[in-house]
Amino acid sequence: MFKLCVFVALLSLAAAAPAPAPAPGLIAPGLVAPGIWGPTVVGSPLVAPQVVSVVPGAISHAAITQVHPSPLLIKSVHGLGPVVIG
């Protein structure tokens, strides 16, 4: 029971922690377009690599961050709705 309480406490702390802000020079300005599940942000092209974050609209807790050299536009992921990229 004690292990369960510790696990729940650590899980609550991890869920409440704010996401780290990316470096200002890594994010490109983007174009915001309306979508069914919310706005879709399309990153603009840059010479330097930029941070690409993919967040399905229907799953708010899922986020994948990676460095990608070119902008991407993804309208949906297996029917889950639009994603935010930029």
From Swiss-Prot:
Cleaved propeptide residues: 17-50, 63-75
Entry's localization field: Secreted
Main location: secreted
Keywords: Amidation, Neuropeptide, Secreted, Signal
GO cellular component entries: extracellular region
Superkingdom of the source species: Eukaryota
One of the GO BP terms on file: neuropeptide signaling pathway
Residues bearing PTM Isoleucine amide: I85
N-terminal signal peptide: 1-16
The name this protein goes by in its record: Neuropeptide-like 3
